């Protein structure tokens, strides 16, 4: 009997098993759209970034003006740049919603998939940080100086590491050149890690909103979820294009319109909005090394979730108290984002410290409350 090409060709077969004939749970909601939206974001970022790299110059004397040149003189350069800058914001919105979904519905119990996902998050954060340095504005330069300088907190090796990273005794041309190189290569590493993420996911199949085994009731991915994903694509692209065409600099920092000047420090150094919660956690620890450890742990703590699960049911859909804790944690992250953009003075410092404690306590208390609730039901 004649088989369709998608089932017989060795290359198409891989794509077919991942995107067409993949058995998917019948009841997955729109919260499961964010994986494909992240794939779309990554493609948008790689394509716009590729064209931007054709016109960008990684030199301290020319970088700022090359970005200016892209926006003024290159055909649709303004569109490429604003799509790329705001695309990063949408990437992080989707990634945070994707992680939130994973925490809520217990998707972290797919341990290898979850751990690869956290590694992808670290890589994406590194990529975004280095991309923010490239326009070589005031906030680019001082952000790079402050964040890379955190490595000096590492005992014994610190200063050597910082100078090795900088390529000199300060953030300068060597730093900009290597950041551009890494910013170019990392998205392709993220792409490779995404393939591994999907490979692990397809070993187990997707989770679903009730957290039960759905093998008895699955449907093919195409056409059902391809069309559902396309609806998500259209909504996200519409919002992204609206932002880009109406208010492209809304999420940026005005200080970055000033060329980098090592002799003038901005009044308030802060990263892009999607890093502010982690920046607030960093600042809330009055010790440099402690702050760096807290900064890394604020993301790395996600890795403990698969190993610290005490509940009988998957996810927190059936745990009312845990739902209150979860939404409280979400509010905590939003408030930390707000604190990260505030100056280092009272009462912001104290609020940041309290919120940091609440943030970390969530990961420790949540499994204990599920255990208590299970015991209550026995």
Swiss-Prot record:
InterPro entries: Cyt_b/b6_C, Cyt_b/b6_C_sf, Cyt_b/b6_N, Cytb/b6-like_sf, Cytochrome_b, Cytochrome_b_C_euk/bac, Cytochrome_b_N_euk/bac, Di-haem_cyt_TM. Pfam families: Cytochrom_B_C, Cytochrome_B. GO terms for molecular function: metal ion binding; ubiquinol-cytochrome-c reductase activity. GO terms for cellular component: mitochondrial inner membrane; respiratory chain complex III. Its cofactor is heme b. The chain crosses the membrane at residues 34-54, 78-99, 114-134, 179-199, 227-247, 289-309, 321-341, 348-368. A ubiquinone binds at residue 202. The keyword Transmembrane applies. It is found in: Mitochondrion inner membrane. Its main location: mitochondrion. Heme b b562 binds at residues 84, 183. Binds 2 heme b groups non-covalently. It is a multi-pass membrane protein. The keyword Protein transport does not apply. GO terms for biological process: mitochondrial electron transport, ubiquinol to cytochrome c; spermatogenesis. Heme b b566 binds at residues 98, 197. Keywords: Electron transport, Heme, Iron, Membrane, Metal-binding, Mitochondrion, Mitochondrion inner membrane, Respiratory chain, Transmembrane, Transmembrane helix, Transport, Ubiquinone. PROSITE patterns: CYTB_CTER (PS51003), CYTB_NTER (PS51002). The main subunits of complex b-c1 are: cytochrome b, cytochrome c1 and the Rieske protein. Component of the ubiquinol-cytochrome c reductase complex (complex III or cytochrome b-c1 complex) that is part of the mitochondrial respiratory chain. The b-c1 complex mediates electron transfer from ubiquinol to cytochrome c. Contributes to the generation of a proton gradient across the mitochondrial membrane that is then used for ATP synthesis. Belongs to the cytochrome b family. Heme 1 (or BL or b562) is low-potential and absorbs at about 562 nm, and heme 2 (or BH or b566) is high-potential and absorbs at about 566 nm. This is Cytochrome b. It comes from Drosophila yakuba (Fruit fly).
């Amino acid at each position: 009997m004649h088989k369709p090409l998608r089932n017989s060709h060795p290359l198409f077969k891989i794509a077919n098993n991942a995107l067409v004939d993949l058995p998917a749970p019948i009841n997955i909601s729109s919260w499961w759209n964010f994986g494909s939206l992240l794939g779309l974001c990554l493609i948008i970022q790689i394509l716009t970034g590729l064209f931007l790299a054709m016109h960008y110059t990684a030199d301290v004397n020319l970088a700022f003006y090359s970005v200016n040149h892209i926006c003024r003189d290159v055909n649709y350069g303004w569109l490429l740049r604003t799509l790329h800058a705001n695309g990063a914001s949408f990437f992080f919105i989707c990634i945070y919603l994707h992680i939130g979904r994973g925490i809520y519905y217990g998707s972290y119990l797919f341990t290898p998939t979850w751990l690869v996902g956290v590694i992808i998050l670290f890589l994406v954060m590194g990529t975004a940080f280095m991309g923010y340095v490239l326009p070589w504005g005031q906030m680019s330069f001082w952000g790079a100086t402050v964040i890379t300088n955190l490595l000096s907190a590492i005992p014994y090796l610190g200063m050597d590491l910082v100078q090795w990273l900088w390529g000199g005794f300060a953030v300068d041309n060597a730093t900009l050149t290597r950041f551009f190189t890494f910013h170019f290569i990392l998205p392709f590493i993220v792409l490779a890690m995404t393939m591994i993420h999907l490979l692990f996911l397809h070993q187990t199949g997707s989770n679903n909103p009730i957290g039960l085994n759905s093998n008895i009731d699955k449907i093919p991915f195409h056409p059902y979820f391809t069309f559902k994903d396309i609806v998500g694509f259209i909504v996200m692209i519409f919002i992204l294009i609206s932002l880009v065409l109406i208010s492209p600099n809304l999420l940026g920092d005005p200080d970055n319109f000033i060329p980098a000047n090592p002799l003038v420090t901005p009044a308030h150094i802060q990263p892009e909005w999607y890093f502010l919660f982690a920046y607030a956690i960093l600042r809330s620890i009055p010790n440099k090394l402690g702050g760096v450890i807290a900064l890394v742990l604020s993301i790395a703590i996600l890795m403990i979730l698969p190993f610290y699960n005490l509940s009988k049911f998957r996810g927190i859909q059936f745990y009312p108290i845990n739902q209150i804790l979860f939404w409280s944690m979400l509010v905590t992250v939003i408030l930390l984002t707000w604190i990260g953009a505030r100056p280092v003075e009272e009462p912001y410092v104290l609020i940041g410290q309290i919120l940091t404690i609440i943030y970390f306590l969530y990961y420790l208390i949540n499994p204990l409350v599920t255990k208590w609730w299970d015991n209550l039901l026995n």
